[in-house]
Structures are given as C-alpha cells and as structure tokens.
A protein has these predicted regions:
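Short, positively charged and aromatic/hydrophobic N-terminal segments
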Residues: 11-14, 18-21
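C-terminal regulatory/oligomerization modules of transcriptional regulators
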Residues: 4-8, 121-148
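N-terminal helix-turn-helix DNA-binding core of bacterial DNA-binding proteins
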Residues: 25-59
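Arg/Lys-rich, alpha-helical DNA-contact motif
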Residues: 97-132
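Residues within the alpha-helical elements of helix-turn-helix
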Residues: 56, 94, 111
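Basic, amphipathic "hinge/linker" alpha-helix immediately C-terminal to the N-terminal HTH DNA-binding motif
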Residues: 83-101
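Canonical helix-turn-helix DNA-binding module
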Residues: 50-81
Length: 148
C-alpha cells in the first residue's frame, strides 16, 4: 500500500459536511443509501420489496414508504404491477456509482489493515462525501498499483 493511498484515506475519512455532487445533481445521503440498498437487493434476490429495504437499512416501513414516494416523485424509481420497486435509469446510475464506490473503498480500507466491518461502515460514510474527481483519482491509483 503506497503512502499516497494512505494519505487519501486519512484525508477523506475526516471529511464531513461538504457538498456532494453525484451525476452533477445534489442528492441527499439517505436517498443514495436507499438507491444503493435497492440495487443490492435486486442483485441478491432479483426483486426489491419495501420490507426488504427496511430490513437492509434498519429503518421502519413508514420511513421506506416516505422515501420511496420521494424517490418516485424525483424519477429515480417506479413500482411494477406487483408492487415491486424498480430502479429507473437515473436511480440506477446513482445506485451503481454508490455501490462501486462502496466496494472499492471497502477493499482499500481492508488492505490498509482495517477490520472488515469497520471498513464497510467507513466506506459507507466516505462514499457520499467524495467528489467524482477524487474518487476517479483513487480508482485510477488503485488500478495502476493493483491494490484492488
């Protein structure tokens, strides 16, 4: 692990309260979490139910109902005739971006010696605050140095 990579993580693990840009539009961290969880559930099970989103995120069903209403109104999700949640293209793009960040940051933190559960939790926090430019640089650095 190079010193440069370690410096990135020391810097970004302390970043909080900065403005985030995802796909050149602002979106709240909670919305990113919901979209990412929906993508993960779709990959795991082939479908996404509100109750499963609640279980995955550790939130109440009414919280999921409120969030899905807002996400639907914003054009990120819809519901199929069976009531399953379907990610629309804008929501899928955000979910994939967050999930990619989460996986890469988790792997890098583990390579730095962070315990796996802590690495996952920290990656979840970092993924939301990292600019596109900074994440692209970290990803490029990791690939060039075969750190992931």
């Amino acid at each position: 692990m190079t010193n440069l990579c370690l410096c990135f993580f020391l810097l970004f693990s302390r970043v909080s309260g900065i403005f985030r840009t995802v796909m050149k539009m602002n979106i709240h961290k909670s919305a990113e979490d919901y979209l990412e969880a929906m993508l993960m559930l779709k990959e795991e099970r082939g479908y996404v139910r509100s109750i499963d989103v609640a279980d995955k995120l550790g939130v109440t069903k009414p919280s999921v109902s409120y969030a899905t209403k807002r996400l639907r109104e914003s054009g990120y999700i819809t519901f199929d005739p069976a009531g399953m949640i379907v990610l629309l293209e804008p929501g899928l793009e955000i979910a994939e971006r967050m999930y990619e960040r989460h996986k890469l940051l988790t792997r890098l933190l583990i390579r730095l010696g962070v315990e796996a559960e802590t690495a996952r939790e920290d990656a979840c926090r970092i993924e939301h605050d990292l600019s596109v430019e900074s994440f692209d640089a970290i990803r490029r650095h990791a690939r060039e140095h075969r750190e992931v």
